[in-house]
Amino acid sequence: MIFVIHAMDKKDAINTRAKHYKAHRQHLDDSEKYGVGVITAGPFVADDNETPIGSLFIIEAKDRAAVKAFVESDPYHTNGVWEAGGVEIHAYHKKRG
């Protein structure tokens, strides 16, 4: 199954995000440990086209439980970059592209 993860940063998270960026990238590289494959991932940015304000992932996984475990172990989640309760996980049906 394909899932989309939508996670918005806390308003004051820019420094925390930067501090945990390398660990977050390593987590993405290690996604197979959680039974998920990252199709694409990247930050949402502010209108200045530079300042990160959240994260978007499109991943493949056998089920929502694997996705949830992957998200909850992400350094951005464990270190409070993302808004509490602000992470959404949705199943996705690819129709084009």
Enumerate the language-model features and the residues they cover:
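Conserved, structured core segments of small domains
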Residues: 1-97
